[in-house]
Regions:
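Donor-nucleotide binding loops and adjacent catalytic segments primarily
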Residues: 201-312
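Short gly/pro/ser/thr-enriched loop/turn and capping motifs at secondary-structure boundaries
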Residues: 40-41, 57-61, 134-141, 145, ...
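Conserved nucleotide-sugar donor-interacting segment of glycosyltransferase catalytic cores
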Residues: 88-159, 204-205
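Short loop/helix-cap segments at secondary-structure boundaries that form the rim of catalytic
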Residues: 39-46, 119-123, 141, 192, ...
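Conserved nucleotide-sugar phosphate-binding/catalytic loop shared by glycosyltransferases and other
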Residues: 34-78, 151-153
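Residues at the starts of beta-strands that form the adenosine-phosphate
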Residues: 30, 49, 127, 216, ...
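Nucleotide-activated sugar donor-binding and catalytic core shared by glycosyltransferases
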Residues: 1-11, 15-34, 38-49, 107, ...
Length: 411
């Protein structure tokens, strides 16, 4: 079969696509990966055919993007952010996907490109599968992750999800239909209830909702690349790790574009005074500053290698980082910024493998100091190891997703 795997976003949004595409290719299928250009190096190493979507995700998620800044400051997705992405890219994304899907049997698309992919699938008469890195189906069990809120009463969760879905649907259909008119095509016909959904998260972290009504949902587990057996840490990192007790990892991945980040970083470092720590630079270049001897700056390192070697993990709770943290057996100090991050932070806390999430806008050295003392208690560490063992017993996510896609296509 010829399969298109498509998505857009930060590193945490892109690596699952790479993992799924590589799994499908290993299974003997012809695969085209449609994603941000930042996937180029790893896609090349894995021999994947990458088609680059116009518009760099990294440039969108910076201080130069008013929508991103507003989203991060409010903690909730700003329609201005979606407007920027859609206004700049709709026509180009449809054209890129259309070329990639020539001769394809199925498109597997994640949230930001699922409407564009539906447009192409409709025009070519091919199947579409919706890959979700965070849940969007209505349920009483929890609020919609992209609402940026947690702790809402059950009766409110379904109406809130309906509102978010309806708003997004109206917005995206309008943009897609304008592009289709320009291309001489009829209006988009998309029936969500007919789409097979692959839920790319651990059922230990988030079990199936008790009241989902969608007829075709498969929780596959997270889509992750295998560990790289050839990766070796830089000498300075290896020496730092060997020179004392396990450090506390601090990193916010793709979070960038907020002037307050350096202030929050300083509060965290002050709160960890007297403890060994690793500070990951990330997109915001957080480690580009003078640091105390107890804090070691690092660039990129595989989470599945570094996290198990740490005493705790301070992170933003993106879906990918959340899964890697839970799998590592190391407890977390969640500092969620917005989007779906408060949702995943709340999941870690409710599982007993993280402190109560810290609002970055209220972070102080005292708050961090108390969280570090809490998260390193033996009972929290034991619970983190227990959850890691439960996740390790789950089926492999990309293998399960590959099987589900083939079933969808009648194979």
């Amino acid at each position: 079969m010829r399969i298109v795997v498509a998505g857009y976003g930060s590193t945490g949004d892109t690596l699952p696509l790479v993992a799924l595409a590589a799994s499908l290719q290993r299974a003997g299928h012809s695969v085209v990966l449609v994603a941000d250009g930042a996937a180029g190096q790893i896609a090349g190493r894995l021999g994947l055919d990458l088609r680059v979507l116009p518009g760099s995700a990294r440039s969108m998620l910076t201080v130069g993007s008013p929508g991103w800044s507003r989203t991060m400051k409010s903690g909730r997705p700003s329609m201005q952010l979606f407007a920027e992405v859609t206004r700049l890219n709709t026509r180009g994304w449809i054209e890129t996907l259309d070329a990639a899907a020539e001769g394809a049997d199925v498109i597997v698309a994640t949230t930001l490109v699922v409407y564009h992919s539906a447009s192409v699938a409709q025009e070519k008469g091919i199947r579409l599968v919706f890959g979700q890195l965070q849940p969007s189906l209505e349920t009483r069990d929890y609020p919609p992750p992209l609402s940026g809120v947690v702790g809402t009463p059950g009766w409110l969760n379904r109406p809130l999800a309906d509102l978010i879905s309806a708003t997004g649907d109206l917005f995206y259909r309008s943009a897609i239909n304008k592009a289709r008119r320009d291309l001489g095509q009829p209006r988009l016909q998309l029936a969500w209830e007919a789409l097979p959904i692959l839920a790319a998260w651990s059922p230990t972290l988030l079990p199936a909702a008790s009241d989902w009504t969608h007829p075709n949902v498969t929780i596959t587990g997270p889509w992750q690349l295998p560990s790289d057996p050839d990766w070796q840490p830089p000498n300075d990192l290896a020496e730092f790790l060997a020179d004392g007790e396990p450090p506390i990892y601090v990193g916010f991945g793709s979070m960038a574009g907020l002037g307050e980040l350096s202030t929050w970083r300083d509060a965290i470092i002050q709160g960890l005074a007297g403890r060994r720590a690793l500070l990951s630079s990330g997109w915001a270049a957080l480690a580009d500053t003078d640091l105390p001897d107890t804090v070691h700056p690092i660039g990129w390192a595989p989470h599945d290698w570094i996290f198990p070697r740490c005493a705790a993990i301070v992170h933003h709770c993106g879906a990918g980082t959340t899964h890697q943290a839970a799998q590592s057996g190391t407890p977390s100090i969640p500092v969620p910024f917005g989007m779906d991050q408060p949702f995943w932070a709340d999941r870690l806390y409710k599982l007993g493998i993280a402190t109560r999430p810290i609002n970055p806008r209220k972070i102080t050295s005292e708050v961090v100091r108390a969280a570090a003392a809490e998260v390193t208690r033996p009972e929290v560490t034991r619970k983190a190891l227990e959850i890691a063992q439960r996740i390790a017993s789950e089926p492999d996510g990309v293998t399960a997703a590959t099987s589900a896609i083939l079933r969808t296509c009648g194979l």
